[in-house]
């Protein structure tokens, strides 16, 4: 069970990709990210095509260019080559937009809102910020005029609203998998969602709620960084094209314009206000909305270009190329073997049955992976991984006792906890130092703690 809010939709799909008969577990889940990014880019292309009339050649060409612009944007590209939830987040946001009955040629069926609700519910089961999609769909069901059925009276509108609600409930029901998984006591079991309090702690993202809208002291610097990111994603030409698509609405349905603007503003404000160093990843849906505007702007340019359409298309492809080449160097992770070298050093250097104390996300997550997946056939299920920063949580201490029943743990965490751990167990105790050349330092079977142990425990 993953860290809050649990990400059940991502975990279900990741388990399917883990069934692939080749590559390491990391490679297989990386393929999920890559496939999601490709899918999101294809949906951007389709959205631009539909917004321009469906079968119009210019709309199709502009859609293809917009899809490539989004797919080659550094942020989406960086998420497509790692095991993370944000590629899938972009795909599900794009799918939710595509499912809304606002596009030319959309079927006038009340089932459309149920389908939209199911996609959006799955998006919520992947990332909680997908909540920004909900007002768009529910508002359309209540007040929209995209479908003739919606104009026939309040009864039809209430049926549409009910369909959307049923679909949402069906998608969000994926969260019910978390207590089932947690009841099996897996080695990684954030929050122990098999209890009511643990489930609520997990799915509401309680540890991170204090970070929401807490970055306002850094507002100006974040706005500057955000503006720089926009240019970095699409280049100066793409930026102008996107603004053209936003401001010049010759073919775009009015309701679609307002929905895209709503999503753009909501995700941008949330990303700027979320007080973490990597909050820029929450801008992906805003970049997606901008990519659709970019495609619409390109369509306007191509219509105005007349006989120069091919020249304009070629120039934009050149601009894409010059934006993508430096991005490729930044996002290329094929030569980054930091986690692999760390895992190899720990697995090969740890004494049999050692207790390994970690303190950060990067060494904790890496060791959880390497303990389970092994390295070149070297599995180390004998190692006991203890994440020091999680020890204040009752659910984590209970999980340790369930996962490692032979290990005696101190009753309560606190100062001298590592010394007490060594006193209670006839096992080597090690600590990871991911920033140092010597990433693992161990003290084997020392009772009472020596000076060297005290140095390690206080590090």
Kindly give the residue locations of the regions a language model identified.
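Transmembrane-helix motifs of polytopic, lipid-linked glycan transferases
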Residues: 31-55, 95-99, 292-296
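Membrane-interface transmembrane helices that cradle and orient dolichyl/undecaprenyl
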Residues: 51-57, 80, 96-116, 120-123, ...
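C-terminal luminal/periplasmic domains and tails of membrane-associated envelope-modifying transferases
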Residues: 344-355, 359-365, 374-459
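Perimembrane helix-loop-helix junctions
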Residues: 102-105, 132-169
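Hydrophobic, aromatic-rich transmembrane alpha-helices
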Residues: 147, 231-254
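Aromatic- and kink-enriched transmembrane "portal" helix at the membrane-lumen/periplasm boundary
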Residues: 11, 19, 23-26, 30, ...
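Transmembrane-helix signature of polytopic, membrane-embedded enzymes
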Residues: 44-72, 91, 107, 111-112, ...
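Hydrophobic/aromatic-rich transmembrane helices and adjacent perimembrane loops
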Residues: 261, 269-303
């Amino acid at each position: 069970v993953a860290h809050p809010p649990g990400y059940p939709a991502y975990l279900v799909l990741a388990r399917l990709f883990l069934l692939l008969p080749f590559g390491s577990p990391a490679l297989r889940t990386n393929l999920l990210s890559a496939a999601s990014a490709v899918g999101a880019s294809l949906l951007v292309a389709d959205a631009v095509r539909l917004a321009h009339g469906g079968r119009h050649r210019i709309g199709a060409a502009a859609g293809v260019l917009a899809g490539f612009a989004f797919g080659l944007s550094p942020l989406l590209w960086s998420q497509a080559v790692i095991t993370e939830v944000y590629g899938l987040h972009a795909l599900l946001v794009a799918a939710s937009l595509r499912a809304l009955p606002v596009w030319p040629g959309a079927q006038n069926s009340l089932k459309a809102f149920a389908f939209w609700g199911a996609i959006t519910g799955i998006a919520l089961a992947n990332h909680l910020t997908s909540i920004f999609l909900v007002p768009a769909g529910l508002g359309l069901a209540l007040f929209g005029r995209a479908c003739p059925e919606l104009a026939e009276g309040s009864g039809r509108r209430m049926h549409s609203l009910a369909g959307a609600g049923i679909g949402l409930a069906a998608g969000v029901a994926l969260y019910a998998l978390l207590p089932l998984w947690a009841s099996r006591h897996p080695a990684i079991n954030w929050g122990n969602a098999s209890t009511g309090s643990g489930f609520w702690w997990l799915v509401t993202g309680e540890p991170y709620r204090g970070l929401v809208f807490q970055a306002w002291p850094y507002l100006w610097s974040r706005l500057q960084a955000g503006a720089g990111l926009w240019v970095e994603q699409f280049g100066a030409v793409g930026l102008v094209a996107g603004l053209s698509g936003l401001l010049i609405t010759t073919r775009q349905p009015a309701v679609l314009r307002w929905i895209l603007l709503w999503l753009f503003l909501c995700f941008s404000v949330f990303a700027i206000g979320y007080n973490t160093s990597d909050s820029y990843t929450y801008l992906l849906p805003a970049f997606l909305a901008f990519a659709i505007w970019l495609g619409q702007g390109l369509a306007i340019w191509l219509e105005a270009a007349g006989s120069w359409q091919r020249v304009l298309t070629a120039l934009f492809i050149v601009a894409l190329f010059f934006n993508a080449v430096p991005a490729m160097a930044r996002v290329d992770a094929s030569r980054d073997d930091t986690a692999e070298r760390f895992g190899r050093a720990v697995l090969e250097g740890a004494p049999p049955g050692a207790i390994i104390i970690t303190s950060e996300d990067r060494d904790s997550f890496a060791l959880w992976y390497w303990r389970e997946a092994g390295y070149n056939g070297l599995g180390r299920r004998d190692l006991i991984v203890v994440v020091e920063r999680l020890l204040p949580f009752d659910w984590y201490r209970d999980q340790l006792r369930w996962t490692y029943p032979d290990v005696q743990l101190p009753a309560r965490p606190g100062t001298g906890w590592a010394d007490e751990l060594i006193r209670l167990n006839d096992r080597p105790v090690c600590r990871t130092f991911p920033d140092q050349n010597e990433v693992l330092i161990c003290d084997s079977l020392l009772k009472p703690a020596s000076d060297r142990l005290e140095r390690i425990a206080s590090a």
